[in-house]
């Protein structure tokens, strides 16, 4: 069911909860809530002193560089994977980032809440939680998360590339999100809080599309980028950012 829904997103970058008007056409789930609805602040699991720091341009640049590097080498056939015929370079999307930030403000890694946006009906999601007596810098947390997701390549096989497995996640979902050729955009958020003497942080990225069981993670080709209308000038094994990909198909 598709409805035009009007709601207010609270700023993921401020403890003052500044209202930001946002109009989205969302795909309303029959069960469960949208993460952007009735989200008045931090969740019950956030302990004390929760904060959602802003991700600056240097953080965004790093996420895009590392993610597109990985997509590029996978498209070329690294890790014994098939070459990708039409894998696009990723760009940052503010709507996906806002909803990722709202997700982290719940301080729970996995939820069933809908995260659709006007452009993207069924975004994928990857989360990473870290805790300790002290926390690393935001940049280090982002690096640790991307490395953790990347290492799932050891669980992702050529067979999985051709047909995303159904059932319980076997430690491959996050790597599959990173290299899906339906994904064109990414947006991330970070929240940290305290539980007694322990400090915790949750980093989440939303992807513009999610993998569907039984469908390929990406379309293989005899060589990389053979079906791109135009390749990216730097990531030459990836399609340019204006490649016409249908993320909702």
Curated annotation (Swiss-Prot):
Localization, UniProt: Secreted
GO cellular component, one term: extracellular region
Coiled coil start-end: none
Keywords associated with the record: Cell adhesion impairing toxin, Hemostasis impairing toxin, Platelet aggregation inhibiting toxin, Secreted, Signal, Toxin
Tissue specificity of this protein: Expressed in salivary glands.
Span of the signal peptide: 1-23
Superkingdom to which the source organism belongs: Eukaryota
SCP domain: residues covered: 64-207
GO molecular-function terms, A-Z: toxin activity
Residue numbers covered by motif Cell attachment site: 31-33, 220-222
Primary site of residence: secreted
Gene3D superfamilies per UniProt: CAP
Physiological role: Inhibits platelet aggregation induced by all agonists tested (ADP, arachidonic acid, the thromboxane A2 analog U46619, thrombin, and snake venom snaclecs (TMVA that activates platelet through GPIB, and stejnulxin that specifically acts through GPVI (GP6))). May act by competing with fibrinogen for binding to glycoprotein IIb/IIIa (ITGA2B/ITGB3).
Annotated family: Belongs to the CRISP family.
Protein name as catalogued: Tabinhibitin 4
Organism: Tabanus yao
Phylogenetic lineage: Eukaryota, Metazoa, Ecdysozoa, Arthropoda, Hexapoda
